[in-house]
């Protein structure tokens, strides 16, 4: 039986520290063969959207543009001190950190084939380049208290 994992960051009350704990778990869990990490999206009509538009629980909606409401590569609200840019950087850092572990490669090739693996490797390399050009680097965010 293969273990897959999906989790979400950018929920009310989260900090860089709590997100780091989640990412560390995913990064070091050899039982988890695939880990998906989405950024919370406050879709209209949801409780999360209501909280974000009303500024409750440290949330602040920054865009009503529905074309920007994606779970990957986009964020449309502040979560406490976490800006969309920080959430995106954490998501990219996590992807590189999780999928650059060589012990994940063979299961990925078996599951997605060599082309799927190559596409993942390209994304990791692009994300890694982006991380290295960012002065914060991999998981070096200062937590605001």
Give residue ranges: language-model regions.
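Membrane-proximal basic amphipathic "stem/tether" segments
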Residues: 97-145
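A structural motif corresponding to the C-terminal lobe/cap of the Radical SAM core domain
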Residues: 1-112, 142
